[in-house]
Amino acid sequence: MVTTQKAVVLLSGGLDSSTVLFRAKALGYACYALSFDYGQRHRRELEAAIAIATSAGVVEHQILPLNLRLWGGSALTDLSIDLPRDRDLATMSQEIPVTYVPARNTIFLSVALAYAEALEARSVHIGVNALDYSGYPDCRPDYIAAMQEVYRLGTKQGREGQPIEIVTPLIDLHKTDIIRLGHGYGVPWEKTWSCYSDGQQACGRCDACRLRLAAFAELGLVDPLPYAVHPPL
């Protein structure tokens, strides 16, 4: 009897994590989606995460409340910090942006590790990618390698020689590559959400919107999300 391997998939509801989930599902994993209600200004992404998890047919979808607004430190968790708007890609990659949430992936990957170990899952899947690690310190390959060592040393499974693997299938990909990949897996882009604002329409001006719109345009595709504005890219 063949046992389907369990996998925990970190799911925000955006392009990247949705592609990772549909990929894991296509590879035959029994997928357990994990999302966080962490006080993000764009709580609309949680609606997207629920829709994507349902579309993918996950075994379980956990949404963990975690109030990172208690200390802020990011434009995503502190409403007094303005979101960057109307920036080009070159400007975005010059420094760590104010949308970086302090230690967010360390927190998320730690919770995912606990969830995976409790499930006796063999892997945690996360959608970090090349565009992210140009700006975010907790999306870079050396960071993932360090967290993999934490997974090996900090768990019963790891100490017994079967560490839970951190799977990063998008690590070397750009947004255009990710959209191509997700398209092949049938990701319903209209159900995803990338915008840092919290309306029923994406703003079209934040970094996340501009990266997404530029990638769809480069591929000659129409992004099915409704946008408040369609700025020149």
From Swiss-Prot:
Pathway: Purine metabolism; 7-cyano-7-deazaguanine biosynthesis. GO terms for biological process: queuosine biosynthetic process. Its EC number is 6.3.4.20. Keywords: ATP-binding, Ligase, Metal-binding, Nucleotide-binding, Queuosine biosynthesis, Zinc. Disulfide bonds: none annotated. One of its GO terms (molecular function) is ligase activity, forming carbon-nitrogen bonds. NCBIfam families: 7-cyano-7-deazaguanine synthase QueC. This is 7-cyano-7-deazaguanine synthase. It comes from Thermosynechococcus vestitus (strain NIES-2133 / IAM M-273 / BP-1). The gene is queC.
